[in-house]
Amino acid sequence: MAYTPDFELVHIGVNCADEAQAAECAHKFELLFQLAVNPAKESADARFTGTQIEWMKKPGRGEHGHLALATADLPAARRYLEEKGFSFDEESIKHFSDGRVLVIY
């Protein structure tokens, strides 16, 4: 049987024009859906509502944003997606201290 990755949605990243727009969007989302702005996940690049909606403080990867996925076997999942015609940006790779790939776009 063919390998199928066990993808899990980690978060949805939404590109905003700037920090002010990210704050406004996060606030509106909080009002609409009762998902509080999450200061624990705040960074120089993004603001979160809850744990799964990331409001980018400047345009990031993708035209509108990105979907962050996790999988137990990243190398196998990468091969699976490449076989389906998807490509990756080698310059985007971030590694764990032991050399394993942590993130790739």
Describe the function of each predicted region.
Residues M1-E24, G62-L69:
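N-terminal beta-strand motif that seeds the catalytic metal site of vicinal oxygen chelate
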Residues M1-F7, N38, T49-K57, R79-Y105:
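Vicinal oxygen chelate
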Residues I12-V14, F33, V37:
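Compositionally biased, intrinsically disordered low-complexity regions enriched
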Residues N15-A17, T49, M56, A72:
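A structural detector for beta-sheet-dominated domains
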Residues E19-Q34, A76-G85:
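Amphipathic alpha-helical segments
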Residues A40-A44:
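Short glycine/proline-centered loop/turn elements that form peptide/ligand docking sites
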Residues Q52, G60-E63, A72-A76:
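Short, charged/polar surface micro-motifs in flexible loops or helix N-caps
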